[in-house]
Amino acid sequence: MSGGKSGGKAAVAKSAQSRSAKAGLAFPVGRVHRLLRKGNYAQRVGAGAPVYLAAVLEYLAAEILELAGNAARDNKKTRIIPRHLQLAIRNDEELNKLLGHVTIAQGGVVPNINAHLLPKQSGKGKPSQEL
């Protein structure tokens, strides 16, 4: 028998698989790891930290893009523009809290009119008291 655990046959070489593919992510785990090491955030970076961070970033991006796509569809547009990102973030309570101090270029403002500035309702809608 030849040396090895496969029982005589030569071991079939597996193709290399990225850490992103192993974790089932679209965001690059290797790049996040490199940025964590080069950013001087800590002397050492564990193996699980870049995977977790890439997963969180991917989730946030997917959440924002889904809401922005809904805002674009509401405005009868097929392309997401910064205005749609602004509306998506500001209309979502948790994202607005997370990105409260972020300025989005060309985002505009969320439409809002104070109730005191609206014209008062006239008596047309009230039921008549005729007998």
Swiss-Prot record:
Modified residues (N5-methylglutamine): Q106
Keyword Nucleus: yes
Record-level GO cellular component terms: chromosome, subtelomeric region; mating-type region heterochromatin; nucleosome; nucleus; pericentric heterochromatin; rDNA heterochromatin
Compartment(s): Nucleus; Chromosome
Residues recorded as bearing N-acetylserine in the entry: S2
Keyword DNA repair applies: yes
S-S pairs: none
GO molecular function: chromatin-protein adaptor activity; DNA binding; protein heterodimerization activity; structural constituent of chromatin
UniProt entry keywords in alphabetical sequence: Acetylation, Chromosome, DNA damage, DNA repair, DNA-binding, Methylation, Nucleosome core, Nucleus, Phosphoprotein
InterPro entries from the UniProt entry: Histone-fold, Histone_H2A, Histone_H2A/H2B/H3, Histone_H2A_C, Histone_H2A_CS
Modified residues annotated as Phosphoserine in this record: S128
PTM remark: Phosphorylated to form H2AS128ph (gamma-H2A) in response to DNA double-strand breaks (DSBs) generated by exogenous genotoxic agents and by stalled replication forks. Phosphorylation is dependent on the DNA damage checkpoint kinases rad3/ATR and tel1/ATM, spreads on either side of a detected DSB site and may mark the surrounding chromatin for recruitment of proteins required for DNA damage signaling and repair. Gamma-H2A is required for recruiting crb2, a modulator of DNA damage checkpoint signaling, to DSB sites.
Superkingdom of the source species: Eukaryota
PANTHER family named in the record: HISTONE H2A (PTHR23430)
Note: In contrast to vertebrates and insects, its C-terminus is not monoubiquitinated.
Similarity field: Belongs to the histone H2A family.
Name the record gives this protein: Histone H2A-beta
